């Protein structure tokens, strides 16, 4: 490709409404342009990257034995009513009627459509397992689209759905897809982690998120320093401290604390180690518990994990914090003065709290705290459970190393769905015993457009994007200095251009009448991994300057060796 025949569309200035670096660079590099809120046109440079991501995904799906299909973007509302999601999905589901007043939706996902296909096309266990995928535009009416294509309303997604007659078959396909996803993101040279994730409202038995590590990520992910353990912070287990509870050294004391309504105020005013404080959080209880509220206790410097807490039998779902009025009506004190001593409601303490001694907590009297609290002596040890978020330095749940926490961008998610949709849509086959059997399903998604943004978040510097070779818009940029006045420079540039193209290398020849500084800046901005500079002075010594975008160092390569050098260094 020649720049004179191409739409480069680079910008010198960063648009004011672009928040994260990927959004800024995608606009400046001429990859996308905003049409409306959450809607973007992909320009030639951006589309080249998007197609490369898409092709890698498609190749690995084919290698994994998945079968490609294409389903309608517009879906009849009847299917969503049948599955129960018409009322559950919320305002993100774009609903409309056709000229016949028949209701439809613009598909955000395709579980209903694929399940409907299978129930009409597959009748016997002998036809299974089957795994279908598509790469298609989706639409979700996000209330606040932001971060460019990272959270847009319209996006390209690879969604796959597998169907089985046994858990063993589902697990085998799930493992195959896990391996395929790992291969996909490895081929793109992304620093990622496959993390255990909560199944959430979708349900099912297993779930993994594929997270690209980036400081701008929206998710906290946890991984071990010495093993392959990794999990979403909501799911990461906080193991009990190795050392048991120390013996009591202090007497129980009731202290006036009129101006200490938070842990921070208590620590500051009484010079207490925060590790010796406990905070008490009250949430709504289930009817079966026979109580209105449940107390959850975590160490003063730890945070409650609401997903873990919601799984406690006495805790009502969804987890709901008690209001101050409700707390005062039952306890007789405000939220800043709560603690376990003489607390006449169910209590659940975190594992770390169970191992504490001589700690401080509210006295259930406004403006008072107990200091020197010890389990058994002062209050019976209640139910113990893992109800907190892990912190850096915690022991890894597998016993290998300690935990690190980094931000991640979710680019893929795989679920074992079970029979949620097949039961709702009555998708059955004749089993081996001749009786009808409900299918079990797996669901596997990759946000193709989000992968592009995530790759930029992980690969950039002050000059622009640094693409991994596998998804770069071009492999090589040729910058001929003053080619419109130097026949020799033009001849060498054209010869190298044609030779590289013949070898299947994607080349951008900058044949614009521009200053060298502009040419260099544009190629660095759009992130071409390999650049060669051809000038009369270097040609006098039969050399060409080569620069690797990631490493940044310049090398002088013999003109006669430049083709072989590039072929050896380009990773395809």
Curated annotation (Swiss-Prot):
One Gene Ontology term, aspect cellular component: cytosol
Main location class: cytoplasm
Molecular function via GO: aminoacyl-tRNA deacylase activity; ATP binding; proline-tRNA ligase activity
Reactions accelerated catalytically: tRNA(Pro) + L-proline + ATP = L-prolyl-tRNA(Pro) + AMP + diphosphate
Subcellular location: Cytoplasm
A GO BP entry: prolyl-tRNA aminoacylation
Swiss-Prot/TrEMBL keywords: Aminoacyl-tRNA synthetase, ATP-binding, Cytoplasm, Ligase, Nucleotide-binding, Protein biosynthesis
InterPro entries, sorted: aa-tRNA-synt_IIb (IPR002314), aa-tRNA-synth_II (IPR006195), aa-tRNA-synth_II/BPL/LPL (IPR045864), Anticodon-bd (IPR004154), Anticodon-bd_dom_sf (IPR036621), Pro-tRNA-ligase_IIa (IPR002316), Pro-tRNA-synth_IIa_bac-type (IPR004500), Pro-tRNA-Synthase_IIa_type1 (IPR023717)
Catalytic activity, EC: 6.1.1.15
One family name in Pfam for this protein: HGTP_anticodon
Keyword Nucleotide-binding: yes
Biological function: Catalyzes the attachment of proline to tRNA(Pro) in a two-step reaction: proline is first activated by ATP to form Pro-AMP and then transferred to the acceptor end of tRNA(Pro). As ProRS can inadvertently accommodate and process non-cognate amino acids such as alanine and cysteine, to avoid such errors it has two additional distinct editing activities against alanine. One activity is designated as 'pretransfer' editing and involves the tRNA(Pro)-independent hydrolysis of activated Ala-AMP.
HAMAP family: Pro_tRNA_synth_type1 (MF_01569)
Subunit structure of this chain's protein: Homodimer.
Domain topic, free-text comment: Consists of three domains: the N-terminal catalytic domain, the editing domain and the C-terminal anticodon-binding domain.
Recorded family membership: Belongs to the class-II aminoacyl-tRNA synthetase family. ProS type 1 subfamily.
Name the UniProt record assigns to this protein: Proline--tRNA ligase
């Amino acid at each position: 490709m020649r720049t004179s025949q191409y739409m480069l569309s680079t910008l010198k200035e960063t648009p004011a409404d672009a928040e994260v670096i990927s959004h800024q660079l995608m606009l400046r590099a001429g990859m996308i342009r905003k049409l409306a809120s959450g809607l973007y046109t992909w320009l030639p440079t951006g589309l080249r990257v998007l197609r490369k991501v898409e092709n890698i995904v498609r190749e690995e799906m084919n290698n994994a034995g998945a079968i490609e299909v294409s389903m309608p973007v517009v879906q009849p509302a009847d299917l969503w009513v049948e599955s129960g999601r018409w009322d559950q999905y919320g305002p993100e589901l774009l609903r409309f009627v056709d000229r016949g007043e028949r209701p439809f939706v613009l598909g955000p996902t395709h579980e209903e459509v694929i399940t409907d296909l299978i129930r009409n096309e597959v009748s016997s266990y002998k036809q299974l397992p089957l795994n279908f995928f598509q790469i298609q535009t989706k639409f979700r009416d996000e209330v606040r689209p932001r971060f460019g294509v990272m959270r847009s309303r319209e996006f390209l997604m690879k969604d796959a759905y597998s169907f089985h007659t046994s858990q063993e078959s589902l697990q085998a396909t799930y493992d195959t897809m896990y391996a395929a996803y790992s291969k996909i993101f490895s081929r793109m040279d992304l620093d990622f982690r496959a993390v255990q994730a909560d199944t959430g409202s979708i349900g099912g038995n297993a779930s993994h998120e594929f997270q690209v590590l980036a400081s701008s990520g929206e998710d906290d992910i946890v991984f071990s320093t010495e093993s392959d353990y990794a999990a979403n912070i909501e799911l990461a287990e906080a193991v009990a401290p190795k050392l048991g509870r120390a013996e009591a050294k202090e007497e129980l004391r009731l202290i006036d604390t009129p101006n200490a309504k938070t842990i921070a105020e208590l620590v500051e005013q009484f010079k207490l180690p925060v590790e010796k404080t406990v905070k008490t959080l009250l949430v709504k209880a289930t009817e079966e518990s026979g109580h209105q509220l449940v107390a959850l206790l975590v160490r003063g410097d730890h945070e409650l994990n609401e997903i873990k807490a919601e799984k406690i039998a006495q805790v009502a779902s969804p987890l709901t914090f008690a209001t101050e009025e409700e707390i005062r009506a039952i306890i007789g004190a405000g939220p800043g003065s709560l603690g376990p001593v003489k607390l006449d409601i169910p209590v659940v303490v975190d594992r770390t709290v169970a191992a504490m001694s001589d700690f401080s907590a509210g006295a259930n009297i406004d403006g008072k705290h107990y200091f020197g609290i010890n389990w058994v002596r002062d209050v019976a040890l209640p139910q113990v459970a893992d109800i907190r978020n892990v912190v850096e330095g915690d022991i890894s749940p597998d016993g290998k190393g300690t935990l690190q926490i980094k931000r991640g961008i979710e680019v893929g998610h795989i679920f074992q769905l079970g029979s949620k949709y097949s039961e709702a849509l009555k998708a059955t086959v004749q089993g081996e015993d001749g009786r009808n059997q409900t299918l079990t399903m797996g669901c596997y998604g990759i946000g193709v457009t989000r992968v592009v943004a995530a790759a930029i978040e992980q690969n950039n510097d002050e000059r622009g994007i640094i693409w991994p070779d596998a998804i770069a818009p071009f492999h090589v940029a040729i910058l001929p200095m003053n080619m419109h006045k130097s026949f020799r420079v033009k001849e060498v540039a054209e010869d190298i251009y044609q030779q590289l193209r013949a070898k299947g290398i994607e080349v951008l020849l900058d044949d614009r009448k521009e200053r060298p500084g502009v040419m260099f800046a544009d190629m660095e901005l759009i992130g071409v991994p390999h650049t060669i500079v051809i000038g009369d002075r270097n040609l006098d010594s039969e050399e060409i300057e080569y620069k690797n975008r990631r490493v940044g160092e310049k090398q002088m390569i013999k003109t006669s060796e430049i083709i072989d050098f590039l072929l050896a260094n380009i990773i395809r």
